[in-house]
Amino acid sequence: MEDLKKVVAYKAVDEYVQSNTTIGLGTGSTVFYVLERIETLMKSGKIKNLVCVPTSIDTEMKAKSLGIPLTGLTKNLKIDIAIDGADEVDSDLNLIKGRGGALVREKLVAANTACFIVIVDESKMCEDGLGTTGAVPIEILSFGYEMIIESLLKISALKNCTYKLREKDGEIFITDNHNYIVDFFFETPIENLVKTCEQIKMTTGVVDHGIFANMASIALISKSNGTILTLNKNK
């Protein structure tokens, strides 16, 4: 599986990353291969004057260790493209993200780029709908978190879900934004995806959620037969 991640990450960089651009960098194991490829092309001189926007402390530290120039998400910044992985992708390029814990910053960068490119291996494709292969994360405030969860359980799509406050090393997991994450688990694909997104986001105390609906521009899917499938939102 690591080979599939590497191949698709390298493909994304080779095909879409150009000199004199600003790149949004996602979070996770596949994105580390993106960083690796960017470093190689910068050292060879094939890419110049590149600056990147990291979506997590992990990505920031890795990029710094490779000498990749970074900037923050500032008011007048133009992000030419963003490259990130995903936990699930459907045929309409809707996504589940955030199982790595960086969903808010990932979504903020994705929402402010001209082109959001998703890179995954074929195991992440969910043709029958999203939400059934693992957690659907929702980042919430730590203050009053139990009350926030109770409010979320009133949403129609979440009523029959099981849920768990995310932990790490026996402690409550804290995001880079100093919030909690509650993971919801669906037995069947999420119905009324866009409406559910809106209802979750409108819940007081919710920072954001891991459903990325109508955000991806392009998906590159690395397949075990050695090919890479490109899906374009506009086609």
Where are these regions (language model features)?
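N-terminal active-site beta-alpha-beta segment that forms phosphate/nucleotide-binding
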Residues: 1-84
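Conserved phosphate- and dinucleotide-binding cores of soluble alpha/beta proteins
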Residues: 3-7, 57-235
